[in-house]
From Swiss-Prot:
It holds the Pfam family UPF0758_N. GO terms for molecular function: metal ion binding; metallopeptidase activity. Gene3D superfamilies: Cytidine Deaminase, domain 2 (3.40.140.10). Residues 116-238 form the MPN domain. Belongs to the UPF0758 family. This is UPF0758 protein Ajs_3450. It comes from the Bacteria.
Length: 238
């Protein structure tokens, strides 16, 4: 149904202005960005289809169509990923990518201005924006100063859907480069599960021991997936 055929108070833009953004669904917020749909497909339907779960190839686990699995997956999509969606021209793709970058910068600014563990949820959201939509495993590190504020984030290793090789020596060298006092380790699980594996637990302890040799503390190891995040520290695994 075209937006103009909806009652005025049900149209996303008017609803946002009257009741605030929290009153809108993800699809309604996205529809405001998209503005128009396609022939035979209203903008709300297009927005919902973009947010639907992806269809994955059973053999490779890679996306074979469908949506992006929610806001985090959509906003992490590359320009090439967005090009496959009929109706998303260059202007709409640019707007979506700009929104993602603004969200990243806002979260990074928050982390730099206060102690990271004053808001562990902000850390998890920041990592989800960076890692949750990836179709391959990525291992990243947040380097922190003595006040637990963010110095930098680096993606250090990439792997297949099932394995990422992580070299402790490289993590130690990057920590020394940034003069970090502490780190938060992070990686994604493209499978969608955030439960840590035995390999995740072993890697955490290996890196913790290596970084302790240069007086750098491991504060947490966060695992992210589309729509979810898990703190290994909160599970007693760090």
């Amino acid at each position: 149904m075209p937006l103009k055929d909806l009652p005025l108070d049900a149209q996303p833009r008017e609803k946002l202005l009257a009741r605030g953004p929290a009153a809108l669904s993800d699809a309604e917020l996205l529809a405001i960005l998209l503005r128009t749909g396609l022939a035979g497909k209203g903008v709300l339907q297009l927005a919902q289809e973009l947010l639907d779960d992806p269809v994955r190839d059973s053999a490779t686990g890679r996306s074979a169509g469908g949506g992006f699995g929610g806001i985090a997956g959509l906003l992490h999509a590359s320009s090439q990923d967005l090009q496959r969606i009929k109706g998303l021209g260059p202007a709409k793709r640019a707007e979506l990518m700009a929104v993602l970058e603004l969200a990243r910068r806002a979260l990074a600014q928050q982390l730099r201005e206060r102690e990271v563990f004053d808001s562990p949820q902000a850390v998890q959201h920041y990592l989800q924006l960076h890692l949750a939509g990836r179709t391959h495993e990525v291992f990243a590190v947040l380097f922190l100063d003595s006040g637990n504020r963010l110095i930098a984030m680096e993606e250090l290793f990439r792997g297949t859907l099932t394995q990422t090789s992580v070299y402790p020596r490289e993590v130690v060298l990057r920590a020394l480069h940034h003069h970090a006092a502490a780190v938060v380790l992070a990686h994604n699980h493209p499978s969608g599960s955030v439960q840590p594996s035995r390999a995740d637990e072993a890697l955490t302890q290996t890196l913790k021991a290596a970084l302790a040799l240069v007086d750098v503390r491991v504060l947490d190891h966060v695992i992210v997936a589309p729509g979810a995040a898990l703190s290994m520290a909160e599970q007693g695994l760090v």
